[in-house]
Each structure stands twice: as structure tokens, then as C-alpha cells.
Amino acid sequence: MGKVLSKIFGNKEMRILMLGLDAAGKTTILYKLKLGQSVTTIPTVGFNVETVTYKNVKFNVWDVGGQDKIRPLWRHYYTGTQGLIFVVDCADRDRIDEARQELHRIINDREMRDAIILIFANKQDLPDAMKPHEIQEKLGLTRIRDRNWYVQPSCATTGDGLYEGLTWLTSNYKS
């Protein structure tokens, strides 16, 4: 009955996996979307999962820790993922190559072949933050031709760009 009602009223559900290097801002983004406020976070060991409703879409967001020791566990969360949010700290130029390697490792996994990709180019408020076109180039996104991707500039602490990212996900997701 729930599926019938959601077809009539347009409520969709989407499973989102939010990944990125440690300290990119994943947990801050999750709770800014969920609670509408900036929260103090500690490094995520394991995961946080929250449902965020926006424009008649229920996003089930899985925020998984990004420390290098736990990245091998990311693949256990891939199954059923419809959208990948990959968060990049745009002020961390020293680790942008590491971010690119991790992103391509994720999207080349067959479990993730149907997921659309939203990149949050986060921490845009910091001096010398890389702009979206630079992130696009440094992450090698132009080589991804077999699926939809988008780079959204964002600032997790103020919320800038976050809802624009969700809007992109809703308009590009085919249920």
C-alpha cells in the first residue's frame, strides 16, 4: 500500500552513500541537513545513518568514516546504493590525489555501477579552497562518461550548496 501511495503522491526514497576522506565534512553535512544546525563532530568510526526528507524524497543517508584504516570497509555499504555523495575538502590540496584514487576505486566497483555521483566541493568558505572546475579536473571526472555526475560547491557549516545538491540528486535519479 505504501508503494501505491508513494506513486500517487510522488514520495520517493533514495539510498545515499556519503563517502570521502577523513575530515572532509561528511558528518557535518549529514547533521546540517538533518537538524538544520552545525554540530561539533568527532572522527566517525563506523557509520551514521539518518533519513533526510526534502522535496517529497526520503534520502536514507549512510555517512561512513573516512580514515584510511577503515576505507576497505566502504564496499560493505555499496549494495543498493542509488546515489553516491563524495565529499571533498577543497582546502586540502595535499590529499586531492588520494581523494581521486578513492573516488575511482568506489565508482569502478560493479556494485556501484548504477549510482549517480554528487561531489560536494566542501569548505568553499576557506581561503585558497579549490573551485568546482578545479575539483572536476583534479578528480578526473571528465573521464566518467557512463553515468551522471555533478560537482556542487558547498560549505557544511553554513549549509551553502547542500540543498542544491539534493535537488540535483532528485532530478537525476530514475527510480
UniProtKB/Swiss-Prot annotation:
It catalyses: GTP + H2O = GDP + phosphate + H(+). GO terms for molecular function: G protein activity; GDP binding; GTP binding; signaling adaptor activity; thioesterase binding. It is found in: Cytoplasm, Cytosol; Cell membrane; Endosome membrane; Recycling endosome membrane. Keywords: Cell membrane, Cell projection, Cytoplasm, Differentiation, Endosome, GTP-binding, Hydrolase, Lipoprotein, Membrane, Myristate, Neurogenesis, Nucleotide-binding, Protein transport, Transport. The lineage of its organism: Eukaryota, Metazoa, Chordata, Craniata, Vertebrata. It is a lipid-anchor. SUPFAM superfamilies: P-loop containing nucleoside triphosphate hydrolases. NCBIfam families: small_GTP. PANTHER family: ADP RIBOSYLATION FACTOR-RELATED (PTHR11711). The keyword NAD does not apply. A lipid is attached at residue 3 (N6-myristoyl lysine). Belongs to the small GTPase superfamily. Arf family. It comes from Gallus gallus. GTP binds at residues 23-28, 41-44, 63-67, 122-125, 155-156. The keyword Nuclease does not apply. A lipid is attached at residue 2 (N-myristoyl glycine). InterPro entries: Arf6, P-loop_NTPase, Small_GTP-bd, Small_GTPase_ARF, Small_GTPase_ARF/SAR. This is ADP-ribosylation factor 6. It comes from the Eukaryota. It is an enzyme of class 3 (hydrolase). One of its GO terms (biological process) is endocytic recycling. Its main location: cytoplasm. GTP-binding protein involved in protein trafficking; regulates endocytic recycling and cytoskeleton remodeling. May modulate vesicle budding and uncoating within the Golgi apparatus. May contribute to the regulation of dendritic branching, filopodia extension and dendritic spine development. Signal peptide: none annotated. Its EC number is 3.6.5.2. GO terms for cellular component: cell cortex; cleavage furrow; cytoplasm; cytosol; endocytic vesicle; endosome; filopodium membrane; Flemming body.
